[in-house]
Amino acid sequence: MLGGHNGAGARHGRVAALAVAAGMWLASGAAAAGEIYLRGGFGLDRPGDTAFMDEDCSSTAPAALYGCGTGGDGAPYRSAGGFGTVPAVGLGLGYAAGAARFEALVEYRPAFAFRGRTNFLAPGRQQSVSANLSSVSGMLAGFVDLGAPGLPELGRLAPFVGAGIGVVRTRIGKTTMTFPTTTTTVPGGTRTGLAWMATAGVAVALGERVTLDLAWRYTDLGAVRTKRGPGRVVWRDGSQEPRPLDLAPTRARLAGHGVRLSLRYVMGGF
């Protein structure tokens, strides 16, 4: 299942790359005079539901966390859940010429959480899962302003579309799995991989140099990955000694929709 997600992400990433290349081509063909601008803003993302599963469910040394069986809900062993609402802050440096803009964009998601349930036990029994995450992404993005003659006018609102592609480094902390009598801990991990986004929004000029952007954005940050490492099972009543585990990696996909509110400030032209 995860392989299919990754294949789709790669295809979408290639589409985003083509869109960025198109934006660069438009910029190169636009008027010679352009403007350098700085962007700062914040936003909220709502990643879609996902599931942590083994990279190799048949692994024995190290041991697969979930294994290849079927859980009490009839699905493969996994931890299914979501990341909730994710805050993001961003900073960009861009060049605008004519209808095209080209931008180097960095976004930081300082703190968000996975909350879900495993399916080892029958539905309704305690088997909750939690972990905290953060990510930093860097992308090259292209935008096209759509205020061309012949298109519908929206008053002071200037619509735009864009896409970007780059890299992301995502970190997940220790995962805690709570069962009726035991608690299992899984080591965290970091992963650097492909990231891409597509966006559409409107801009409002607040002055000669300042523009407010409000945009929808779809962002694909690829996979979140726990690393191979030591975990353990603890009996909360102390009836047994903690059991150490040598665990193989697991992963889940991190992608979803969000909104962005930002200000662009023109620093100068050339």
Protein language model features and the residues they cover:
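Cleavable N-terminal export/targeting peptides
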Residues: 1-35, 269-270
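Short loop/turn motifs that connect adjacent beta-strands in outer-membrane beta-barrel proteins
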Residues: 30-35, 147-158, 206-209, 268-270
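Transmembrane beta-strand segments of Gram-negative outer membrane beta-barrel proteins
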Residues: 33-48, 159-161
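Transmembrane beta-barrel architecture of outer-membrane proteins
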Residues: 35, 84-90, 101, 135-139, ...
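Outer-membrane beta-barrel "beta-signal"
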Residues: 35-37, 253-270
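Residues on the lipid-exposed face of transmembrane beta-strands in outer-membrane beta-barrel proteins
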Residues: 40-42, 89-97, 106, 140-146, ...
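Extracellular/periplasm-exposed beta-strand and loop segments of Gram-negative cell-envelope proteins
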Residues: 47-84, 107-138, 167-193, 222-258
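Substrate-binding/catalytic groove segments of enzymes
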Residues: 171-173, 204-213, 222-228, 270
